[in-house]
Amino acid sequence: ITYTEPIGVETITPNPVKPGEVLVIKGEYLNLIKEVIFFEELPVGEDDFIAHSRKEIQVKVPMEARTGDVTLADASSEDSDALRNLIHVKGLVVILPSVEAPLDLTAKKPGDEIVVKGKDLDLVNIVKMPNGEEVEFDYAKSGEGEETITFILPENATNGAVVMIPASGVEVGIANIGMALHEKVVATPASGLRGGDMITLTGINMELVTTVTFPGMEEAVEPAAKSATEVEVVMPVAAISGELLLNTASGTSVPVAITTLKPEFMAFVNDAVSLGGDVTIQGKNLDLIAKVVYTGGAEVEVTPNSTTELTIAMPT
């Protein structure tokens, strides 16, 4: 004679349930259950049941539990030889920390304190920036029950979503960053520039600027001075006309157009010159010339000592 004891589940409460709370499973022949398996293979063995009888199991929901099906097993998952019967219970909702709506941090700057209000924020283990960096945070709950987490926006924060993460690893968005960048930047002077000139760049949130990259140069230079409204930087000799880039620690850059001085030819002093002789050129900004290229490809390097006149040797 053989017989079976039909294991059955009648109710599972509470649902939704918060990690750390006690889940009560009621049914028949639950005394045969050796393991309660939460979604994605997260088992709790009968030794860890809070209560266990024919009609009821009480089990603490693991902090790592996620929303999904719960499975009851009449043998342990550690028993590789056992032929397990599995009873699936669909639709357990595991509570996550939540906010009513993600904050808009568009106007925020590195160093600003960010306060996030929400529910079940005590579950938060990690606050992560858009670039993947984890930041320290403080959790608080007021006497009226208001929950908050507070953190400081780091220097290298980038645009994107800030998320909070509980033990389950599920990421929940709490804020979106559109970093407060320097905008409407004006360069003074913006034209007629030469190496060694001091350029004043005026705008908003200029204290965010860490370096300046000039057109024609790979290596960035540091500002000579900066404040919330302006940055002062010395024009390198090798810089050319184009867009200089104001760089921030977050990796973002803002372009500003500049124009350098150009040498201007006006006249030759001597109309006829013999090979190997000297020729004198008159013009403007001639001290900017470093090399003269003749028809045919011959080159002569020069060291001007005047802005209006340049004497060079004709090639032989």
Listing of model-derived features with the role each one plays in the protein:
Residues I1-T316:
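Ser/Thr/Pro-rich low-complexity tracts
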